[in-house]
């Protein structure tokens, strides 16, 4: 009887862990970030509950832009160890480091596909910034864009069918673009000074930054009623202020967008509904609060605050409550991913 009761308790505890997606050894419960505490930029992970941090890299090079793989077992990042910027990956324990790219020119902005089988990135090997795809099985990089204006990588669609990126340049080239890496389709979605496209987890919308007369605002592109993405996509303006609004991040349920606004004189973190309504300020101080990232279950956010001078890693509840400082050093900490 006692054994049966114990088994039931352990089973319930296991289910609770899965439901919360935090604690109980969940890989994605930890936050990865960059710290310059040792004099150069290194990749760390930190437990959001205990505040205990562990270095994943420890070398003489600068390691930046960490991003978790979808299964939470690996972190891809950018390293200048070879002299050029290259894409590396490290396991969640920091024991296995692999260089993924080794080609002339800088490689940057790694972005895992939703199934973790491919890594998109930007390469400068041909003289300008182009989007490449690196299958994890073959490790042979494939060029998927080929234009003179530099490309800036944005986001994968949740189903892995499309890659969103942006370009500068003339009206014929600038704006948001969609490319299906497995095919030949290329969609010129917008034709303005647009960048930083972020796909909603439900796949219905793309939030992005539009710069008009030097001012950044957030817009929403929504797919057509037939479920396709075309150049006559529906656009909705989400913010309209004299100061910049940028750095958008979708909640896991696609209902809420976190973003950074400078409407108060410095960068503060806000949230709003997907249609731009109910804009609510979550942080309030005279320092910049930047880079909001949602926890996997949407209950919390990690962000970077300059309240104490250099950037430090903080967390808070999804409504701005229970704000807590995770890193406490005199160096810069930034680029969190949860």
PLM features per residue range, with description:
Residues 11-21:
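Bacterial N-terminal signal peptides
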Residues 2-11:
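Bacterial N-terminal signal peptides that target proteins for export
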Residues 24-338:
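Sequence signature of WD/YWTD-type beta-propeller architectures
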């Amino acid at each position: 009887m006692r054994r049966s009761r114990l088994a039931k308790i352990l089973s319930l505890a296991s289910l609770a862990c899965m439901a919360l997606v935090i604690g109980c050894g969940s890989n994605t419960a930890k936050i990865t970030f960059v710290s310059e505490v040792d004099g150069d930029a290194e990749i760390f992970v930190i437990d959001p509950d205990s505040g205990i941090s562990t270095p994943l890299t420890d070398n003489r090079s600068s390691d930046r832009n960490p991003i978790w793989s979808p299964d939470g077992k690996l972190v891809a990042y950018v390293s200048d160890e070879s002299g050029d910027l290259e894409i590396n990956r490290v396991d969640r324990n920091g024991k296995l480091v692999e260089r993924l790219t080794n080609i002339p020119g800088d490689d940057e902005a790694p972005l895992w596909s939703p199934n973790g089988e491919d890594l998109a990135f930007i390469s400068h090997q041909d003289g300008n910034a182009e989007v490449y795809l690196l299958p994890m099985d073959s490790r042979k990089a494939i060029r998927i864009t080929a234009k003179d204006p530099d490309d800036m990588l944005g986001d994968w669609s949740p189903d892995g069918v499309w890659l969103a990126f942006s370009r500068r340049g003339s009206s014929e080239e600038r704006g948001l673009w969609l490319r299906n890496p497995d095919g030949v389709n290329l969609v010129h979605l917008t034709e303005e000074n647009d960048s930083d496209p972020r796909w909603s987890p439900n796949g219905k919308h793309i939030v992005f930054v539009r710069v008009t007369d030097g001012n950044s605002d957030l817009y929403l592109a929504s797919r057509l009623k037939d479920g396709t993405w075309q150049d006559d996509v529906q656009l909705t303006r989400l913010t309209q202020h004299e100061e910049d609004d940028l750095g958008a991040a979708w909640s896991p349920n696609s209902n809420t967008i976190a973003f950074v606004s400078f409407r108060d004189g410095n960068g503060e973190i806000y949230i709003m509904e997907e249609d731009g309504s109910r804009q609510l300020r979550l942080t309030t101080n005279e320092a910049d609060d930047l880079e909001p990232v949602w926890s996997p279950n949407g209950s919390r956010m990690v962000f970077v605050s300059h309240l104490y001078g250099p950037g430090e890693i903080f967390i808070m509840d999804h409504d701005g409550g229970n704000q807590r400082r995770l890193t406490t050093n005199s160096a810069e900490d930034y680029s969190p991913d949860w």
